[in-house]
Amino acid sequence: MKELVRLFVQIALMRKGPQDLPASAALLAGTAAGYCIINCLISAVLPPIPGHWFGQLIVEIVFVFVWYALLLRVLNRPERFLQTTTAVFGYQAVLAPLWISAVWLVRQFSDDDTWRLPISMLGLAIVVWTVAANARVLKAALEWATPACVALVILQYLAGQILLLYLFSGML
């Protein structure tokens, strides 16, 4: 278990990739469950943010499964699904404490002119790091150039946000 956590940290730091993980459905399920549990624990520690965060988390997890299943099938790389998706959930589990804390800080201090810019910059740095880590995972899985992988990650993020907006705000 310790070695697996170290490996996910190395993936988050962009030193390793999905090819370093075993292709295991059980590991994928455990990693996705771990990602969910980490999100729940961090959200329980921080004062509550209004909204349907748990429902959004479940939709996000299902979306990641569907996104990578379809993407890798369309691009004729379905055999890389287990390792790629495990790597994505693994590095996201590592970065989740930073990301959730940054989102919480942005929401808490959105009206405070003193803290708005530094906290927004922190959030932006985490988003950029997340995109870079995910693009590196995709680059290993697809054997594409980095800019194309960055574009795919941004497309995934936008599609996921549109789905969440549609399901939870009723705006679309």
Predicted segments — roles?
Residues 1-92:
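Selected alpha-helical membrane-embedding segments in polytopic membrane proteins
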Residues 161-172:
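Juxtamembrane boundary at the C-terminal end of a transmembrane helix
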Residues 36, 53, 65-68, 116, ...:
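Generic ordered-secondary-structure signal
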Residues 77-155, 159, 163:
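Hydrophobic alpha-helical transmembrane segments and adjacent short intramembrane/lumenal linkers
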Residues 43-49, 105-112, 172:
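Helix-coil boundary and interhelical linker segments in multi-pass alpha-helical membrane proteins
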